[in-house]
């Protein structure tokens, strides 16, 4: 079934310029809808870790992009929270039974789009989770945090207030941004452009990471890009240019996570009861 979906999506992608809500075939519509449903339920993921390597399923990302070609804008929501969009909200039509079955908590006015997966014991404070994102068990998405399209958020992660996790749709990115299990992302930090923050890492407040951001390891003096090693404690910093005329922003790995760090950043089970 998945192979059939992939084949249909790949073929539709090659013809994407000619797709519209009027002209798309039933086969293409069904394939895209089936894929979005799979994302919404967590049966499909844009990226998954296999044998310690993140594998990106580009065809699923293409299905997300194609979905915007297949729908017109429509009025949705009610009362003061009305929207005019092509993608319905995830919780539209939910009653108490559906929320209890999901096992998560959604604080107004948090919004998740259909096609985003929210696992059990997740808490969504007033935040935004975009289509294709995957938010795993026990994670807190704090106030005004944004989880971008197709971003992958691991288990027991804390995304602090105002954090931005970049998406893949605009500007178009090859790979999603990934925050692995048990990470703490400090307030107003931004992680974008497919950067991977490996498990058990801590980003201090105001850390900005893109593919072009230098990640300087204080212990080794080495500079890397695009990936924060497991168990790192990262703070914002700067590095001087070769001629000493100026400095540029960087991220500095100041140490490895220890018991003291964990005590400061541990999740509060009372909030997830």
Swiss-Prot record:
Gene Ontology terms for molecular function: 2,3,4,5-tetrahydropyridine-2,6-dicarboxylate N-succinyltransferase activity; nucleotidyltransferase activity
The EC number(s) this enzyme carries: 2.3.1.117
Pathway: Amino-acid biosynthesis; L-lysine biosynthesis via DAP pathway; LL-2,6-diaminopimelate from (S)-tetrahydrodipicolinate (succinylase route): step 1/3
Example of a GO biological process term: diaminopimelate biosynthetic process
Localization of this protein: Cytoplasm
Known partners and oligomeric status: Homotrimer.
Protein name: 2,3,4,5-tetrahydropyridine-2,6-dicarboxylate N-succinyltransferase
Protein species of origin: Bordetella parapertussis (strain 12822 / ATCC BAA-587 / NCTC 13253)
High-level lineage: Bacteria, Pseudomonadati, Pseudomonadota, Betaproteobacteria, Burkholderiales
Gene: dapD
């Amino acid at each position: 079934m998945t192979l059939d979906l992939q084949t249909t999506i790949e073929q539709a992608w090659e013809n994407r310029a000619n797709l519209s809500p009027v002209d798309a075939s039933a086969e293409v519509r069904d394939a895209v809808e089936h894929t979005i449903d799979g994302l919404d339920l967590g049966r499909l993921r844009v990226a998954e870790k296999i044998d310690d390597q993140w594998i990106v399923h580009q065809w699923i990302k293409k299905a997300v992009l194609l979905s915007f070609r297949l729908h017109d804008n429509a009025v949705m929501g009610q009362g003061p929270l009305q929207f005019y969009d092509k993608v319905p909200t995830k919780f539209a039509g939910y009653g108490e039974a559906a929320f209890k079955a999901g096992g998560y908590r959604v604080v107004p006015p948090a919004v998740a789009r259909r096609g985003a997966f929210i696992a059990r014991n997740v808490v969504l404070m007033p935040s935004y989770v975009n289509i294709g994102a995957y938010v795993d068990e026990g994670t807190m998405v704090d106030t005004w945090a944004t989880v971008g399209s197709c971003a992958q958020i691991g288990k027991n992660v804390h995304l602090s207030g105002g954090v931005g996790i970049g998406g893949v749709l605009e500007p178009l990115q090859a790979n999603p941004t990934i925050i692995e299990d048990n990470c703490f992302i400090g307030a107003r930090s931004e992680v974008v452009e497919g950067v991977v923050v490996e498990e058990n890492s801590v980003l201090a407040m105001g850390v900005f990471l893109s593919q072009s951001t230098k990640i300087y390891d204080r212990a080794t003096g080495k500079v890397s890009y695009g990936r924060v090693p497991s168990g790192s404690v990262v703070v914002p910093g700067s590095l001087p240019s070769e001629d000493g005329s100026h400095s540029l922003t960087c991220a500095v790995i100041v140490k490895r996570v220890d018991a003291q760090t964990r005590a400061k950043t541990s999740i509060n089970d009372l909030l997830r009861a």
